[in-house]
């Protein structure tokens, strides 16, 4: 078994099976499996790329398998997603992508190895553009949803908000770009400039007063300030939400605030640190 590919599969499976957060589960999997350096970078791209492209990958897997993806055993389905991403999005040879994925499926569901081999070989017969041309719906919005791996309702919402499908597709393209890793220097415990100066390939964020961006990549869990609790991983946009709320002028009313992007508590934790 290839450790990097196995780590990526485990992270993808955890997201779909357990509603796990990839940014939380993947670093733990990499550490526990001893995957580091270039192998960790490969596993990271494979994990996040597979998750970003799941909608399109599922359409291609379903066509190659001649069945809906919800009729494929979940472990096999996730392995096929990981294999298909390598075939269609990464500079990985078809033989390596197929062979390693079949080995993975054999370790998960031995009886499904032949099925996986057939599906992946069928996928490898065309590149991504070829598959999109073959599967493209007539409806422009549905076609954009397939091309950009977004649900149709999101594409329609973008069109409504931006006024045209062309503008919406630019936003969808941007939404699929791999985001940089941001750290949040916890107020009162660490200055962002000091954190950035202590790390190679790091810079103070552009917008949040607490942000540091890891421009050189790497495992944020290995950062001493993250390990000792003076910083944590948090997207700069999420930090801005907390900063905006912390600076909001409140009148005498008992206002209620609704977080429509609630997760594991990053914004709430930052608000607590600001309030101390």
For each of these PLM feature ranges, what is it?
Residues 194-276:
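Rossmann-like S-adenosyl-L-methionine
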Residues 1-222:
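Class I Rossmann-like S-adenosyl-L-methionine
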């Amino acid at each position: 078994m290839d450790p990097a590919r196995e780590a990526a599969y485990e992270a993808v499976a955890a997201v779909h099976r357990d509603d796990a957060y990839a940014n939380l589960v993947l670093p733990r999997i990499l550490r526990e499996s001893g995957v580091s350096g270039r192998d960790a970078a490969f596993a990271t791209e494979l994990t996040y790329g597979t998750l970003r492209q799941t909608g399109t990958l599922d359409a291609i897997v379903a066509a190659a398998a001649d069945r809906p993806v919800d009729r494929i055993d979940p472990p096999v389905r996730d392995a096929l997603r990981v294999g298909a991403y390598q075939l269609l999005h990464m500079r990985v040879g078809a033989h390596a992508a197929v062979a390693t994925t079949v080995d993975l499926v054999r370790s998960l569901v031995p009886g499904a190895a032949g099925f996986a081999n057939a599906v992946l070989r069928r996928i490898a017969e065309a590149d991504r553009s070829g598959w999109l041309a073959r599967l493209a719906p007539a409806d422009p919005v549905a076609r954009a949803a397939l091309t950009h791996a977004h649900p149709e309702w999101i594409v329609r919402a973008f069109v409504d908000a931006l006024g045209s499908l062309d503008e919406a597709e630019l936003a969808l393209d941007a939404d699929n770009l791999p985001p940089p890793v941001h750290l949040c220097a916890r107020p009162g415990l660490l200055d962002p400039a000091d954190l950035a100066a202590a790390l190679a390939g790091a810079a103070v964020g552009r917008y949040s007063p607490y942000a540091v961006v890891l421009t050189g990549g790497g495992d944020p869990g290995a950062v001493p300030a993250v390990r000792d609790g003076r910083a944590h991983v948090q997207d700069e946009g999420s930090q801005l939400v907390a900063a905006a709320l912390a600076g909001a002028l409140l009148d005498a009313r008992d206002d209620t605030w609704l977080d429509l992007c609630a997760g594991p508590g990053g914004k709430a934790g930052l608000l607590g640190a600001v309030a101390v």
